[in-house]
Amino acid sequence: CVTGVQTCALPIYSDEWKAEATRRGLDCETSVPLIFDRLLAQENIRMFGETGVLNEVELHARAEVKWETYTKKVQIEARILGDLAMNHILPVASRYQSMLLDKVSKFMAIFPKEKARVLAEQDLELIEKIARHMTCIQTQVEAMVETRKVINKMGDIREKAIAYHDRIAPTFDEIRAHIDKLELIVDNEMWTLPKYRELLFLR
């Protein structure tokens, strides 16, 4: 869904730093499931074994628990985001859009056509913006749900965790970007969830 909305997802490390980290022998992996792979690196298996902390079987078990825990956390976040978007954000945005449409209709009924268009111009722009953001949110949430259904059928716990990281988690920022835009548009009295300023400064 392309609307020109900029998401806040930025690379944690720049390409320049990645090159410098490689030169220094530092790891700057940002994928959580892949970071857990380090538990199973031969040098770590040897170190844990020699110190009597964990044997190889225990390390594999611990890695599996970490992959499963990560997957469940992203699953929960995805379900909550979908619920908030579909059952809280979209209904409120739709009601505000209907209110604007009613206002425009009254302009059209009272004033001459050209004057009514001038008076309703800003409201019409808001109506279109709301429609675009609502469409993108609904499309992305539905796509996220279908993708989750496919991923949940995966048998390999590591591959499932990687799929949730690569295919589900990035959609959170995309959906949130459109919700943030609606938050700035919808009437404050109609918005049912706490806004950012309300989280920082209690009314």
Describe the role of every protein-language-model region.
Residues Y13-R203:
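Mature extracytoplasmic or organellar-lumen-exposed domains after removal of signal/transit peptides
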Residues C1-C8:
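Single conserved hydrophobic/aromatic residue that forms the stacking wall/gate
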